[in-house]
Amino acid sequence: MSRIKIILLACMLALLFSGCVENSAVFEKNTATLKENTINADSVRGYDIASANNAFAFDMYSQLTQQVTGDYENILFSPYSISAAMAICYEGAENTTKEQISNVFYFPTNKTVLKVRLERINDRINSGSGDYELQTANALWIQEGYPVKEEYLFNVKKYYDGEVANLDFVRKPDDSRNTINEWVETRTSDKIKDLVPKSMITPDTRIIITNAIYFNGKWAYTFDKQLTEKRAFYPANGEEASVDMMYMYNNFNYGENSKAKIIELPYKGNDLSMYIVLPKDNNIKEFETEFTINDYTELKNEMDSTVNVDILIPKFKFETKTELSDSFVEMGVVDAFRQANFSGISNSPLKVSEVIHQTFIDVKEEGTEAAAATGVGMTVGMDFSWDSKQREFKADHPFMFFIEDRRTNCILFMGKVEYPEYKNDT
């Protein structure tokens, strides 16, 4: 007898998530009255969710680089979005299934510690200023009539602020797919479309978990469009390309060591920043293989805010869609896809069948839109000259980038630019 399937979706993009789409499915309000979990406050404080999220980010990045087959394949993902969706899955996992998810995502064995910390950090992320848009959203889509435990639903609603809806995957798969895709589009300002393909929903589908994170922010110091011009960019294979390169001269947090340079580009409001890590040698594949979370932390600790920096970085815009099941299995989450134990969700057998992660990013002069960025002095086309108090950050070859929430120290987005193609919307 085949096991009933649970589908996990993680989508990360950019922009404000608005109201629910109109459909026969009705979202339940957070009115559950089950007794809340209690736990020692010291146990909650002892778990550093940012460190766990960031460690997973580097593990996930390593897996994604192994999937790259072409010379110019950019990478973008949201470790926070993936972790948040898997945390909802973890809430119902038991025994070996729970242990494997815990090991890969650095989750504490005590589920209450995790959900209390996630609830607090989600509240902080979703309570930003009016200087930018940053919001997360969770939803649990359940087959009509499928028995899900009341305690699980209560925890999803309370601690994960999850919306819950019943759909008919069996008799109305197209309607169900359209409802979920419209939910995603609404919460990503139409940047992510058709997340759920027709082939995903089958008669065995019982639950779909979705998470979305959206960010739209302006730079604290915007790049002057008049200083953007075509300049040379050198992909890893050495073939020169002409790309739109933005220029700015200003005071920024900047650091370097023998292998790389790093710069922090803050967004308006100073709650979030983009960090760009530029290898000194044009060999991104060798660099990323050796670059660890500890290296990243140490490089950030080298940053100095007292120097002026001449910056050249390319505009870039791209989107990705990745199926992560094989990556998760390689990382150690095996039973969830095979001999799963999700008895905390339902007494009926469940297993994860697919994990889809779809992303979008747009980095230009004004800032960054991600789903999931004061030029002074030099005239366009002039050669640059440097003095001892200046630093140069010339991103004319492949680099890594991170978008972090400075309030929580969480890496929300992580990626790599191999080739900075930029196409304006038509």
Curated annotation (Swiss-Prot):
Family matches, as CDD domains: serpin_like (cd19591)
Q: Which InterPro entries match?
A: Serpin_CS, Serpin_dom, Serpin_fam, Serpin_sf, Serpin_sf_1, Serpin_sf_2
Q: Which PROSITE patterns would you find in this protein's record? A: PROKAR_LIPOPROTEIN (PS51257), SERPIN (PS00284)
Q: Which UniProt keywords apply?
A: Protease inhibitor, Serine protease inhibitor
Concerning Gene3D superfamilies, the annotation shows: Alpha-1-antitrypsin, domain 1, Antithrombin, subunit I, domain 2
Known PANTHER family for this protein?
Answer: GH10112P-RELATED (PTHR11461:SF211), SERINE PROTEASE INHIBITOR, SERPIN (PTHR11461)
This entry's Gene Ontology molecular function terms read: serine-type endopeptidase inhibitor activity
Q: Where are the residues marked Reactive bond as a site?
A: G381, M382
Protein name listed in UniProt: Uncharacterized serpin-like protein MM_2675
Entry keyword annotation includes Zinc: no
What is one Pfam family matched by this protein? Serpin
Native organism? Methanosarcina mazei (strain ATCC BAA-159 / DSM 3647 / Goe1 / Go1 / JCM 11833 / OCM 88) (Methanosarcina frisia)
Q: Where exactly are the transmembrane stretches of this chain?
A: none
Q: Report whether tRNA processing shows up as a keyword of the record.
A: no
Its Gene Ontology cellular component terms are: extracellular space
Query: Could you say which protein family the record assigns here?
Result: Belongs to the serpin family.
